[in-house]
Amino acid sequence: MVKVIASSLRKGNVVDIDDKLYVVLTAENIHPGKGTPVTQLDMRRISDGVKISERYRTTEQVERAFVEDRPHTFLYEDSDGYTFMNPENFDQVIVTKDVMGDSAVYLQEGMECMLSTHNGVPIAIELPARVTLEIVDTEPTVKGQTASSSYKPAKLSNGVRTMVPPHISAGTRVVIMTADNSYVERAKD
């Protein structure tokens, strides 16, 4: 554990408060016209997912936990959770469903992810920013609909719904942002 000033915390940092680990979701430095500047932290407790909001004076000390980030390759999913392999030493790590969260729908066999561990225990996983998926269902294009920049709903091969341009049809492979399920472009493969 390392003590740091609250204003140096950023999104993704892990802090130790009362022997519980929290991941920082947002960190905002607020400088009011009158009074001392403060740092507003929105955090999620790693053990059970409870979200909290804390305010610290910018010079206050906070304990930042040592977190190790290493690339891992996704292998498979089973009843225990999601199995990842470290490509350096071929060790396999099981990540539980609650650590994986909503991003599990984007996992594909062989996908490279960044796994964060604290004392050897997986606490967070970061997927690639973009994934390529196939459109399995979408509304047909209506003639003249392309005049305006309208989007239509589409269902991806992993079950996620997104909005795509009118020229995209079922069977087309598209690139999707994993952070917000948004369409980026047609896949170039």
Swiss-Prot record:
Family, per entry: Belongs to the elongation factor P family.
Keyword Cytoplasm: yes
GO cellular component: cytoplasm
Gene3D superfamilies tied to this protein: 2.30.30.30, Nucleic acid-binding proteins (2.40.50.140)
Compartment list: Cytoplasm
Xref: Pfam families: EFP, EFP_N, Elong-fact-P_C
Any GO molecular function: translation elongation factor activity
Name the UniProt record assigns to this protein: Elongation factor P
PANTHER family reported for this sequence: ELONGATION FACTOR P, TRANSLATION ELONGATION FACTOR KOW-LIKE DOMAIN-CONTAINING PROTEIN
Major localization listed first in the record, in broad terms: cytoplasm
Alphabetic keyword roster: Cytoplasm, Elongation factor, Protein biosynthesis
Gene Ontology terms describing biological process: peptide biosynthetic process
InterPro entries: Elong-fact-P_C, NA-bd_OB-fold, Rib_uL2_dom2, Transl_elong_fac_P/YeiP, Transl_elong_KOW-like, Transl_elong_P/YeiP_cen, Transl_elong_P/YeiP_CS, Transl_elongation_fac_P
CDD domains: S1_EF-P_repeat_1, S1_EF-P_repeat_2
Biological classification of the source: Bacteria, Pseudomonadati, Pseudomonadota, Alphaproteobacteria, Hyphomicrobiales
Pathway, per record: Protein biosynthesis; polypeptide chain elongation
PROSITE patterns with a match to the protein in the record: EFP (PS01275)
Role this protein plays: Involved in peptide bond synthesis. Stimulates efficient translation and peptide-bond synthesis on native or reconstituted 70S ribosomes in vitro. Probably functions indirectly by altering the affinity of the ribosome for aminoacyl-tRNA, thus increasing their reactivity as acceptors for peptidyl transferase.
Disulfide bonds: none
